[in-house]
Curated annotation (Swiss-Prot):
Belongs to the KAE1 / TsaD family. It is found in: Cytoplasm. Required for the formation of a threonylcarbamoyl group on adenosine at position 37 (t(6)A37) in tRNAs that read codons beginning with adenine. Is involved in the transfer of the threonylcarbamoyl moiety of threonylcarbamoyl-AMP (TC-AMP) to the N6 group of A37, together with TsaE and TsaB. TsaD likely plays a direct catalytic role in this reaction. One of its GO terms (biological process) is tRNA threonylcarbamoyladenosine modification. PANTHER family: TRNA N6-ADENOSINE THREONYLCARBAMOYLTRANSFERASE, TRNA N6-ADENOSINE THREONYLCARBAMOYLTRANSFERASE, MITOCHONDRIAL. Gene3D superfamilies: 3.30.420.40. GO terms for cellular component: cytoplasm. It comes from the Bacteria. Fe cation binds at H115, H119, D311. This is tRNA N6-adenosine threonylcarbamoyltransferase. The keyword Cell cycle does not apply. The gene is tsaD. It catalyses: L-threonylcarbamoyladenylate + adenosine(37) in tRNA = N(6)-L-threonylcarbamoyladenosine(37) in tRNA + AMP + H(+).
Length: 356
């Protein structure tokens, strides 16, 4: 049974996991995450230098813990995997160097994994994962994309955000409302007691150069500006800020936009399954709305398990195992890290010489 040790350090979560493929089913044998959220909360966002230092401190202990829980020595692994792109370069380097060092020391293949490919693989950790082809709504702190996953696991991006990702918009609006970082969970909690229909907010669209709009693309900068102006107007009128109603109205319009464009894209592509992955996919309103409207339109909706929506190493291991069993030999030990790299060029992460 193929078994991998996987590492994730692309942003503000240090993570390690042990995964095994047993009769075609992925098994998470052990998984550990050390979150840095509380450390970064005082600055209202991730500080790259602090993130890198905290990864250096946490990762060795996490690796030791998952190895002990799995009861597995390094000699019994088939590969080591680590996120190498995209993300904070310094943070990525911690996981990459650790992974490559372990692979070299124990003569194991190393798999440099694209972080977004990991998110796409997270749905395979569900008890009943969907079978491709399907449309993925990848919605996280740094990315909002619509990706078609084909029967042979090929990936084609059909839509994207042209400015802020949905998760970034949640964080920025959270700060505007005086909420703690990260904004997503804080807005969800506050919105639970609010009136989502009280304020009318714009659904940003992206214009085409020749006229019309990109049907599957997203823009959240206008929504963010509308929220700023609304808060300023209410404050200048000396009104008590209706934070719960503001949070609920914002959360509702984000969910509306994500659901409407995802289902439009799925229908246009003739796809009967939509998959949601990424940190924002944990949002309760989004999950409920996508499920309800998908059912109304005859589209099956799958979501990655909640514990694997936010950054974790299990999803990196899932992506690595998928590569391993498909016959990929691994990445060069000379592969570095990159803050940005397109998802449609993941194949070159396994080329020699490496792309970076």
């Amino acid at each position: 049974m193929p078994t991998v040790l996987a590492l994730e350090t692309s942003c503000d979560e240090s993570a390690a996991a042990v995964l095994r493929l047993n009769n075609g089913c992925l098994q998470v044998i052990a998984s550990r995450i050390a979150s840095q959220v509380e450390k970064h909360a005082q600055w209202g966002g991730v500080v790259p230098e602090v993130a890198s230092r905290l990864h250096v401190e946490a990762l060795p202990h996490l690796v030791e813990e998952v190895l002990q829980e799995a009861g597995q020595s390094m000699a019994r692994f088939d590969a080591v995997a680590a996120t190498v792109t995209p993300g904070l370069a310094g943070a990525l380097m911690v996981g990459s160097v650790t992974g490559r060092s372990l692979a070299a020391l124990h003569a194991l293949p190393f798999f440099g994994i694209h972080h977004l490919e990991g998110h796409l693989a997270s749905v395979r950790l569900a008890e009943h994962p969907p079978r491709p082809p399907y449309l993925v709504l990848l919605v996280s702190g740094g990315h909002t994309e619509l990706i078609r996953v084909g029967a042979e696991s090929e990936m084609v991006r059909l839509g994207r955000s042209h400015d802020d990702a949905a998760g970034e918009a949640f964080d920025k609006v959270g700060r505007l409302l005086g909420l703690a970082y990260p904004g997503g969970p804080a807005i969800q909690a506050l919105a639970a007691t609010g009136d989502s229909g009280r304020f009318s907010l714009p659904k940003g669209r992206v214009s085409k150069p020749g006229g019309g709009f990109h049907p599957y693309d997203f823009s959240f900068s206008g929504l963010k500006t509308a929220m700023l102006r609304l808060v300023q107007a209410l404050s200048e009128a000396d009104e008590d800020l209706p934070r719960a109603d503001l949070a609920a109205s914002f959360e509702q319009v984000v969910a509306d936009v994500l659901v409407e464009r995802s289902l439009l894209c799925a229908n246009d592509q003739g796809l009967k399954t939509v998959v949601m992955v990424g940190g924002v996919a944990a949002n309760r309103r989004l999950r409920e709305l996508m499920s309800k409207r998908g059912q109304e339109q005859g589209i099956e909706v799958h979501t990655a398990p909640l514990r694997y929506c936010t950054d974790n190493a299990a999803m990196i291991g899932a992506a690595a195992l998928q590569r391993l069993v498909s016959g990929v030999n691994g990445s060069s030990l000379e592969l570095g890290v990159a803050a940005r790299w397109p998802l449609d060029k993941t194949e070159v992460l396994y080329h020699s010489p490496p792309p970076f």
